UniProtKB/Swiss-Prot annotation:
Gene3D superfamilies: 1.10.8.50, 30s ribosomal protein s13, domain 2
Species of provenance: Shewanella sp. (strain W3-18-1)
Quaternary structure and interacting proteins, as annotated: Part of the 30S ribosomal subunit. Forms a loose heterodimer with protein S19. Forms two bridges to the 50S subunit in the 70S ribosome.
PANTHER family associated with the record: 30S RIBOSOMAL PROTEIN S13/40S RIBOSOMAL PROTEIN S18 (PTHR10871), SMALL RIBOSOMAL SUBUNIT PROTEIN US13M (PTHR10871:SF1)
One GO BP annotation of this record: translation
Protein name as annotated: Small ribosomal subunit protein uS13
Keyword list, A-Z: Ribonucleoprotein, Ribosomal protein, RNA-binding, rRNA-binding, tRNA-binding
PROSITE patterns the record matches: RIBOSOMAL_S13_1 (PS00646), RIBOSOMAL_S13_2 (PS50159)
Length: 118
């Protein structure tokens, strides 16, 4: 298994699909990486040479992925909560942020129903 950005990439899959195992790289970005490194999208990881895997590593290193991306996302959410803006308040209360209704629905965000105390 090739190791890119601290993640073991599956050997049996095509390059584009295998790169999506890295958090922060989807299909579009994986295709862009393959185009930039001149590696065929349909080539399997086990068929690539070490030099090609090194070029993939260098190209992936240009993007914000894995732990750094997770940290940035959590810092952005924390910043919103510290500002006290509407989105920050919604995060703090674990409610939907983007205008969805909450009288009914929103169960995923709100969690399981709580019994009414008498």
């Amino acid at each position: 298994m090739a190791r890119i950005a601290g993640i073991n990439i599956p050997d049996q899959k095509h390059t584009v699909i295998a790169l999506t195992a890295i958090f922060g790289i989807g299909r579009t970005r994986a295709r862009a990486i393959c185009a930039a490194t001149a590696i065929a999208e349909t080539a399997k990881i086990k068929e690539l040479s070490e030099a090609q895997i090194d070029t993939l590593r260098e190209e992936v290193a240009k993007y914000l992925v894995e732990g750094d991306l997770r940290r940035e996302i959590s810092m952005n959410i924390k910043r919103l909560m510290d500002l006290g803006c509407y989105r920050g308040l919604r995060h703090r209360r674990s409610l939907p942020l983007r205008g969805q209704r909450t009288k009914t629905n929103a169960r995923t965000r709100k969690g399981p129903r709580k019994p009414i105390r008498k």
